[in-house]
C-alpha cells in the first residue's frame, strides 16, 4: 500500500470530516491509482477515521443551523457529497429535528414583520424562499396562511 496515499487522506481528515466521495475525488485529482485510493480509504474506515454516516450527521447539524430544510440537505448530501440514500435516510430518521418548528423560526427570522394580511406578491416571495431552502410546502403553508392549492 502507498503510504503517501494514506498520509494524504489522514492529513485531509485531520482538518475536517469528508465523505468517501469527496476523498476519492481529491485523491483522483492528485493522480493516485484506484487501488491506492481503495486501500487508503479502507484502512481509514477500518480505524473509523472516515465514516459517511458520521459525516452526514455533522453535515445535517451544520445545515440545520444555517436554516436549511430536509429537502435541500438530502439533495446536497446525495448530489454534492455522494452519500448513499440509505445512509441519508437513516440519519434523517434518527434526527430529532422538528422541521415545522424550524420552518416557523426561519420564517420569523427572515420576515419579522410578516402577517397573514400580506399581499399575494409577498406571500409568493416567502413561498419561494422557503422552497429554495428545502422545506416542503406542508411544513410552512399554514404558517403563511395559505393553502397549497392557492399557488397551483
Swiss-Prot record:
It comes from Haemophilus influenzae (strain PittEE). This is Regulatory protein RecX. Keywords: Cytoplasm. The keyword Cytoplasm applies. Belongs to the RecX family. Modulates RecA activity. It comes from the Bacteria. InterPro entries: RecX_HTH_1st, RecX_HTH_2nd, RecX_HTH_3rd, Regulatory_RecX, WH-like_DNA-bd_sf. The lineage of its organism: Bacteria, Pseudomonadati, Pseudomonadota, Gammaproteobacteria, Pasteurellales. One of its GO terms (biological process) is regulation of DNA repair. Its main location: cytoplasm. Pfam families: RecX_HTH1, RecX_HTH2, RecX_HTH3. GO terms for cellular component: cytoplasm. It is found in: Cytoplasm. The gene is recX. The keyword Transferase does not apply.
Amino acid at each position: 500500500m502507498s503510504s503517501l496515499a494514506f498520509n494524504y487522506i489522514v492529513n485531509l481528515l485531520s482538518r475536517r470530516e469528508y465523505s468517501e466521495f469527496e476523498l476519492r475525488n481529491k485523491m483522483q485529482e492528485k493522480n493516485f491509482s484506484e487501488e491506492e485510493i481503495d486501500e487508503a480509504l479502507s484502512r481509514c474506515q477500518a480505524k473509523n477515521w472516515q465514516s459517511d454516516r458520521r459525516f452526514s450527521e455533522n453535515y445535517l447539524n451544520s445545515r440545520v443551523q444555517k436554516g436549511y430544510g430536509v429537502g435541500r440537505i438530502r439533495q446536497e448530501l446525495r448530489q454534492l457529497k455522494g452519500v448513499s440514500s440509505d445512509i441519508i435516510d437513516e440519519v434523517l430518521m434518527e434526527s430529532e429535528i422538528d422541521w415545522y418548528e424550524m420552518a416557523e423560526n426561519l420564517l420569523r427570522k427572515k420576515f419579522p414583520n410578516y402577517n397573514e394580511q400580506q399581499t399575494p406578491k409577498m406571500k409568493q416571495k416567502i413561498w419561494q424562499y422557503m422552497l429554495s431552502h428545502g422545506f416542503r410546502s406542508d411544513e410552512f403553508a399554514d404558517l403563511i396562511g395559505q393553502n397549497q392549492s392557492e399557488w397551483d
